[in-house]
Amino acid sequence: RATVVEALVDGGASELLEEGDRIRPASTGERNDLYARHASPLAVEAGGRALAAAGVDPAEVTHVVTASCTGFVSPGPDLALVRELGLDPGTARLHVGFMGCSAAFPALRTADAICRADPDAVVLVVCVELCTLHLTASDEPEQIVAMSLFADGAAAAVVAARPASGPVLALDGFLT
């Protein structure tokens, strides 16, 4: 499981642990501070890998669409992507926030609409979630299942209307 919460990593800091090694609920401020520190670097790493895998030069990116529901920071990962990946400062940016687990679908739908409207558009879509920030100690089955399914991470895709040189996936429809 990936986590940015050091207290959950072997040998990590104990700022989120109570006596008896029980996780205490972090305050909203503590969770958001961790989100602000870790979300952008994860997004940049995923975005850079997606561009490299697609063989797309950062200068070709016309739009950035990001999605996240586990925290908020402004300026956010969208601006970090532009700055740290060397995208044009005028790159259009959009953040899809607080739409839950399925936010990648509206983000991809937005990228698809951009590319249908402008066949020369190249859209970098990056989703970043830091789910372990919201980990709570509980013996409720729903909480146990949720915490066993979700971890911290980021995923990215490059969406374009132009012909690709290698294997691609087609965005054929969205039902969210």
Where are the regions that the model predicts?
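Condensing-enzyme catalytic core mediating Claisen C-C bond formation in acyl metabolism
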Residues: 1-36, 122, 137-176
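Conserved catalytic cysteine-centered active-site region
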Residues: 22-25, 30, 37, 41, ...
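Conserved nucleotide-sugar donor-binding subdomain of glycosyltransferases
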Residues: 35-46, 50
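Phosphate/pyrophosphate-binding loops at sites that engage ATP/ADP/AMP, CoA/4′-phosphopantetheine
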Residues: 46-61
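Conserved beta-strand elements of the Class I
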Residues: 62-65, 122-124
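Glycine-/small-residue-rich "gating" segment that lines the acyl/pantetheine channel
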Residues: 91-109, 116, 130-165
